């Protein structure tokens, strides 16, 4: 971080935003722009007031990047922009496209624990050999192979999308865990010893979820 750093990309724990906790609390007094998901922004609206600009993150990544580029060009040393994202923003998060677009030295990154970490803590499993995939992007599917996997999903249909992808590639699924609303009041973990068809999957899946599974070689898996 340098004196020119005016944009701060801050990871948030799944429990939510805490305005009184560093590093967020270190920057709020000079904040002019806050970017984040709906549940990240709401706790800060009353704290920061109407003079601060709020921009929600949905599927509008180009808009977010363009707004931060304008903020960096405005070069106001007494003002900050804050970007809030769950976990580590540079790990399957909004931080990657922002870091690729912004000038070097114009931003800092403050990671929180990732949802992968939190998932395996709940399961009581080591995860240093786990492969990670994401279904947030529709442009490229994870390159599957046998082993223990964790998947970031795109919502309540995510577990079906993951299982469909794996089964259609001819692999088997064992020891699957569906982890919902990690760190929140509605936290829930459901286990499935074996998944041979998506018909056994529940319909009441919460939108914020992770899927952990062991992918096994199948008789007809695609190479």
Feature-to-residue mapping (PLM):
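Class I S-adenosyl-L-methionine
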Residues: 1-108, 117, 139-141
